[in-house]
């Protein structure tokens, strides 16, 4: 789960619920809410499952967030968990959403990468904020109905000490962008986007490889990336450059 409320639409809304037993943390519920359609992830220690901890955490979430304008709740889980617990969804009155995503990982081996004279991969600053927002909004407009959500992502990534927002410049113009979250034990890449008119020319691959090479020099972490399974082109790109599937993330919604 994403252990930050930095991107939530209301930073005052409770985002983390902890369940302790005899002083030991055995359950965690996290809330990811970049808009009022929120995503909830619940983790319970394997030795403490089937004891009502997940439901207790969820009841606490419902109570504590009742005064906030939440429009819907989606549960995030993994395909492997549902295969091991096939009764989970029906017990909770949930059905699978058709949208799934795959998390892929990569070791610290650098890429052989020739420099291209008119391309630069740089850490972004505020002067590029509007160009980055525009590019991300065009690339991910189906995910984010409002430009305001994209603007918030970009502004927070520029400010947050645990984030790095990179841009790919071609002849001085922003044609690509990618954010790296450093808050966990991996370099987590997300939001990689190439301007529509520049796709299919290898720039996505160049940006990803360049980022990996730069980050290898800056820290000792391995790499992780998440991609929607419907985004076949991006998934193929990451697999082609050596990212290996780790898990499939599934979203569950209450039955209508």
Task: Give a label for each model feature.
Residues 1-25, 143-179:
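Active-site rim helix/loop that mediates acceptor-substrate recognition in acyltransferases
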Residues 119-134:
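A short beta-loop-alpha structural element at the N-terminal edge
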Residues 50-63, 194, 200-217, 235-240:
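Conserved acetyl-CoA-binding loop-helix of GNAT-fold acetyltransferases
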Residues 27, 97-100, 176, 204, ...:
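A structural microfeature
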């Amino acid at each position: 789960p994403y252990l930050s409320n930095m991107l939530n639409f209301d930073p005052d809304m409770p985002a983390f619920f902890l369940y302790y037993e005899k002083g030991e943390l055995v359950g965690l519920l996290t809330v990811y809410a970049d808009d009022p359609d929120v995503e909830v992830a619940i983790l319970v220690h394997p030795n403490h499952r089937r004891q009502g901890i997940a439901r207790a955490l969820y009841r606490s979430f419902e109570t504590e967030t009742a005064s906030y304008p939440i429009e819907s709740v989606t549960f995030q889980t993994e395909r492997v968990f549902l295969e091991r617990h096939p009764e989970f969804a029906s017990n909770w009155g949930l059905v699978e959403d058709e949208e799934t995503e795959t998390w892929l990982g990569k070791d610290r081996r650098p890429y052989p990468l020739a420099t291209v004279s008119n391309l630069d991969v740089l850490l972004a600053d505020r002067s590029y904020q509007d160009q980055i927002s525009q590019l991300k909004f065009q690339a991910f407009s189906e995910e984010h109905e409002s430009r305001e959500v994209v603007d918030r992502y970009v502004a927070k990534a520029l400010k947050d000490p645990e984030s790095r927002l990179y841009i790919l410049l071609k002849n001085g113009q922003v044609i690509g962008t990618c954010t790296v979250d450093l808050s966990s034990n991996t370099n987590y890449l997300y939001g990689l986007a190439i301007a529509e008119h520049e796709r299919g020319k290898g720039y996505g691959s160049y940006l990803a490889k360049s980022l990996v090479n730069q980050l290898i020099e800056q820290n000792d972490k391995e790499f992780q990336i998440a991609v929607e399974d419907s985004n076949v082109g991006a998934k193929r790109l990451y697999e082609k450059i050596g990212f290996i599937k780790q898990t499939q993330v599934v979203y569950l919604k209450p039955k209508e």
